[in-house]
Amino acid sequence: VAQTCEHLAAFANLPEPAPITPGECEGCIREGTTWVHLRMCLACGTVSCCDSSTARHAERHFRETGHPTMRSVEPGEAWRWCYVDEVLG
């Protein structure tokens, strides 16, 4: 069941940014690591790897930038996540 929070609600009606590195995690490419699934920051379009990936670049991006929300960019998935409130939307 999808939930919401103020962060997810703030991005709900805004156009999504274009993915900066479609189809790949820039951090993994730079560091020579591999990703499991990809996520995209809804604030800036940074594409990063998920928490199941060794490097967890999406979470790292949140910690470094404070950008609170991301979405899955996996085919057939449209869910969003808020790192601040730990809510799936």
List the predicted regions and their residue ranges:
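Cys/His-rich, Zn2+-coordinating zinc-finger modules
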Residues: 3-14, 19-21, 31, 47-89
